[in-house]
């Protein structure tokens, strides 16, 4: 016997369905469910008196014969490819299926089998996303990794050796010895990790040594001398070994101007860090490279979005991070040349146009690694408020804008760094690196972080309490973050040369090495999903005004942001 219930009652019980809309945190961003893979009247739900019981929603099928290890029920999946309601199956640490779960012996349309060996994560009323990828990490301290993980980031790529002055300023791990020691340390951390070697050299030998020693990318940084010769040599080595190059160009224009750097690229693919320029790069016009077909541009989060406080906080940050002395006039001039309200305002709009493709942190080096996700959505909200709906969206929802912005910290850095076959989206066949959110806390405080199919972190109440919820509630590492479960649930990204050689054996590591691939001529700006715009960008050298295809890009700084003090005491 069937019965009819209201949409609100249905949503309370099983989560939103097709046509229902959900607000993301306290922003003005609204998503609308595009499709529901579940079957009305046959939904599965766990709990006392609920559906997933033996002989009902749970079948007799063994895991060996096809039952899932874990099913996330009735979640709203938000990803670059769509916004849908579905059950999501995890098997052997991978995303096995996105569809309708249940017992095929008694239920129709079942493509995910729940058996006695299946665990359940309740996704009703929740949003499910891919784990975030922060591709601009200064590995200054190991405590960073837990902070990033608790924010929903499950993959980190960068360079450094700890709190050395080279690491404070540059995302480079210099030399094979340091690279090897850093990779050995990675066995302690429950996230995917990759090392960028120092790319500043005019001859190839030292760079080849680092790539073969385990680096998955090379980083050119002005503090080590990003000259045209170093750029050309680094890109040549990268082409030979299929690794990505990231660049922080010459702020002082000592060895050339932005045109000279572009010439040194020779049309080759390169990932441009903090493309606006406050984080470093040719002053005042490095932002021009965001319009080039071979440049994969990203932002770092301290300039995201442009607010009334952005300019004031940057000067002190820069002096500390780049070992500058405020009593030296030249050091002060160097710092002031990098901080321009005009280019920071333009950065907001270029993100909204899809001309800036990725978001990252610049952790502890003019960036906050726990705020990559928050600041992405704050930027999206600011642009919705100031620019209205995108042409691709309707008055009902912001689905396209949401897909554009989520791609900036999930699939696009995964493509840029050659790991999109493994991570970066909620798609079958990929590692189950997933984050579950309550809509009211979306992008701010996750409900649950899943790493390769195992819960690795979550908010947890007093361990001595009679139930899991009593205060104090803290984010805590879970069983997936301990022992051999940790090393079995995450990987180290390396070059193909390193993965194919004896590196893992020589270093004695437990984590698997995963080789990056297809990061050179096989990708370009057009590979950046929903973020592939290539406008002609011009910067006035006197006023710093930025134009894209002749249109002035300017916006007011935000006075108030969402996802801020409503959620945090400090």
Swiss-Prot record:
Location of N6-carboxylysine modifications: 219
Cofactor note: Binds 2 nickel ions per subunit.
Reaction equations catalysed: urea + 2 H2O + H(+) = hydrogencarbonate + 2 NH4(+)
Pfam families (alphabetical): Amidohydro_1 (PF01979), Urease_alpha (PF00449)
Keyword Metal-binding: yes
Residues involved in substrate binding: 221
Post-translational modification comment from the UniProt entry: Carboxylation allows a single lysine to coordinate two nickel ions.
Protein name, entry field: Urease subunit alpha
Gene: ureC
